[in-house]
Amino acid sequence: MMQFQRDLEASLEAVSANAQELLKSLKSRKDVQDLNASLPKDPLDNCDAQTQAARAQLAEAATRILQLSIRPQEYLEHLQNGYQHLTCFRWLVELNILDHLPHSGTISYTDLARKASVPPMQLRSICRMAICNGFLEEPEANQVRHSRISALFARDESYLGWARWMVNYSVPAAYKLSDATRSWGETVAKDQTAFNLGMDVKVPFFDHLRQTPAMKDAFAAYMRNVTSNATWGLQHAVTGFDWASLPRGAKVVDVGGSLGHGSIAIAKEHTHLTFVIQDLPETVAGARKEMAQNDKIEASVKSRITFQEHDFFGPQTVKDADVYFLRMICHDWPDNEAKVILSQIRAALKPGAQIVIMDTILPQPGTISVLQEQQLRIRDLTMMEVFNAKERELEDWSSLMQSAGLEISRVNQPLNSVMGLLTVRSAGQTALSGTNTLTPELVAAVSASTGSADSRPVLIAGAGIAGLCLAQALKKAGIDFRVFERDSHIDARPQGYRLKFEADAAQSLKNILPDDVYEAFELSNAVTAVGETDFNPFNGNIIHSRTGGGLSGKKGLYATFTVDRKAFRTQLMTGIEDKISFGKEIAYYKTDDATSTVNAEFKDGTHVTGSFLAGTDGLHSVVRKTCVPNHRIVDTGAACIYGKTVMTPEFLARFPEKGLRFMTVVSDIAPMLQSCLIGDSPVTLLLEPIRFSEASRARYPELPPDYVYWALIGPKERFGSQEVTSMKNFVSLDQAAEQAAKLSLAVTEEWHPSLRALFELQDTKQASLIRVASTIPDIPSWESHSNVTVLGGSIHPMSPCGGVGANTAIVDADALAKVLVEHGTKPPVNAIAEFGAAMRTRAKRNIWRSEVGSKRMFGQKNLVDCSEFVF
């Protein structure tokens, strides 16, 4: 109650003081209304700044008084006035009533209805509703005339265009916002917006705009008025950034600059600058024509401005600019798209270059005038309704910049401007500052968003098994992280299908995974059957077969789980989907000892800073090449085709039944004379049936049909060295898969038909051919770093013949997670060194096991005698 009284009293005092100031100014003005003028003028036109300030404060106080004086029971009545007034306004605009209203004097409703060809009773009711809201006047009974408000629309065609834009496009879109939410929920799709529902169109806004001339004209009128409005005016672009500090001849790129009005305004004031205005081809063509025909632009300005066709989602082609200027660009796009725009610019930044963003900075509620905040909230909702985009608070801007590898160095919120100016640089080059127009809360928001090393996430390069296991372990421990995967999505390429985990990996998984994820993992596994059957490839007869035996107990592989790789990776992503970014390949990284941080640069031009970097990015690891530059990876001389054959009725009828019980091995040894040339090097087929229990399928219906996993491995010469080398030249994964499938048939051409059914009925899109790489068992130590390490296949790749590569990676992830949990994300160097030493010991044992298997399966040499692997 007391707060209500204080607010009412303050608003009344503001009304009184500012009304008196406004009246005093108006009475002192020399210019008086011209009684012979054709249209009424606004008495508040051409007032000085002090008077305009008083007017704005009066409007603000009056608005607050209205809000305070309306009772809750009257709120809906107040809304009724709003939508009925809007309905009447649209009626007057769309039926061109203003065209028939005389510029001076009055006209009867009867005569106006006849001129406009509308029903007289409708006209009178609608005009009187408009009069209630100040749009028209009725000085005497049944006689209507322009008010100072309607006169503006009769005087300025662009305002009428803006009005048409509002009632025909903005309002229908706004009305459908709840329907859009109901239909699509949270989405960034440009063709799933309230605008699409309101206009009943299937294409995004700008596509429809290009196809609809009337809409394009209305939108252009709207934009002209936006840019001419003082609060949106270009003068703030001229004065809001220190353009004078740029060197003579400095280049400014106006990204998405449309007709170039912003650059022209700046160029007029700062004659030492040159400008490149970028936009889409159609826009650039119109802009060039308009500038050529505009005699009001001086030749000295035109000579310093060029236009360039450019799509800001593509690579930025101007790489020598001093400033990239984005005015009202980012707010049209959700964070992912805005990040792409900024990342493309960041990739082109030369040292010292800056990005100047002029766009809306949403305030915290109640921190600015209610009328100004209303306009900003309107823009925020409009972005949502039309583009599934948003206006951003300062913290949102800072987060967006960080995601694109940028940092805000300065924020300026000009007085009486609805847009602020953000000065942005590449991350690590900034020193945050602000102007006295910033509130302490806004400055604090920027400071908080930059973060300290302790608050920065662990960066995980690679969303393979090691990377995802580490991520789950960190999540379980409450440590922030981000995962970056080079592939575009989880199924971007075949990566093998079956994995077998032994006791050590099973225990690590139990340590790593939350209880619910571990339970789901157990239930999604395939049925494990222990044993081996060996076949003669040429007659299809069984050579050896044994259930259990050496593959069980303490004598062999200790097989605990049989896992479908895709199902396993899906389980590993459970609960951390929002932390994984696909299509992110690291180009390089650098550490900063002063801040104890690591900065990763991606090939798409984006950047991220973290407290620690874990390289799990596979054989081609960029992290390993930087962290352990002399690490030895050898070429085993083998190639391997991985494949998958679904257990269809036809396959089950053709393939030997006893070959589908457990692990099956088929060894094709070279004939006598051929072995003289290439050695007695066999090609070996390993296969295993992957079957899921009824309980697993009931819980996870998305599990694949039962299938046979197989791997055909042998010397590259048996596959054709040229074929193996040429695989990387295929332009698509489908082509490479098809060629690998054909190669599997060629290599097994003389095998028994029953066994060849495996290859003849394979899913040809799932085949993949790889060269088999490994490191040597005795991995040399390397200099450790407190911010970076490598693990899994990134540092100790091994032949699949041992079947323990994934096991080793899982245990690595568990071990590293324990280090980070114990010491935090800035562990001492000795802790990382101890982790590395233990990992090398573990890897040595498993690499040796793979080496033994490789010698038996394809005649591999000792790993230390193998040549270097050529990437």
From Swiss-Prot:
UniProt region (FAD-dependent monooxygenase), positions on chain: 430-871
- Positions annotated to bind FAD: E485, R569, A806
Catalytic activity annotation: nor-toralactone + S-adenosyl-L-methionine = toralactone + S-adenosyl-L-homocysteine + H(+); toralactone + NADH + O2 + H(+) = 1-(3,4,5-trihydroxy-7-methoxynaphthalen-2-yl)propan-2-one + CO2 + NAD(+)
Pathways per UniProt: Mycotoxin biosynthesis
The entry marks the following residues as binding S-adenosyl-L-methionine, namely D279
Q: Does the keyword DNA repair apply?
A: no
Task: State one molecular function term (GO).
Answer: O-methyltransferase activity
Induction context: Expression is positively regulated by the cercosporin cluster-specific transcription factor CTB8. Expression is also affected by nitrogen and carbon sources and pH, and is also controlled by another transcription activator, CRG1, previously shown to regulate cercosporin production and resistance.
GO BP terms, alphabetized: methylation; secondary metabolite biosynthetic process
Keyword annotations for this protein, in alphabetical order, are: FAD, Flavoprotein, Methyltransferase, Monooxygenase, Multifunctional enzyme, NAD, Oxidoreductase, S-adenosyl-L-methionine, Transferase
Stretch forming the signal peptide: none
Answer yes or no on keyword Nucleus: no
Residues forming the catalytic site: H331
Q: What happens when the gene is disrupted?
A: Abolishes the production of cercosporin but accumulates the naphthopyrones nor-toralactone and toralactone, as well as the oxidation product of nor-toralactone, naphthoquinone. Adopts a dark yellow-brown coloration, with slight export of pigmented metabolites into the agar.
Q: Where is this region: O-methyltransferase?
A: 1-429
Pfam short name (any one):
NAD_binding_8
Q: What is its EC number?
A: 2.1.1.-, 1.-.-.-
Question: What protein family is recorded?
Answer: In the C-terminal section; belongs to the paxM FAD-dependent monooxygenase family.
> What role does this protein play?
Dual O-methyltransferase/FAD-dependent monooxygenase; part of the gene cluster that mediates the biosynthesis of cercosporin, a light-activated, non-host-selective toxin. The perylenequinone chromophore of cercosporin absorbs light energy to attain an electronically-activated triplet state and produces active oxygen species such as the hydroxyl radical, superoxide, hydrogen peroxide or singlet oxygen upon reaction with oxygen molecules. These reactive oxygen species cause damage to various cellular components including lipids, proteins and nucleic acids.
Record's protein name: Dual O-methyltransferase/FAD-dependent monooxygenase CTB3
Instruction: State the encoding gene.
Output: CTB3
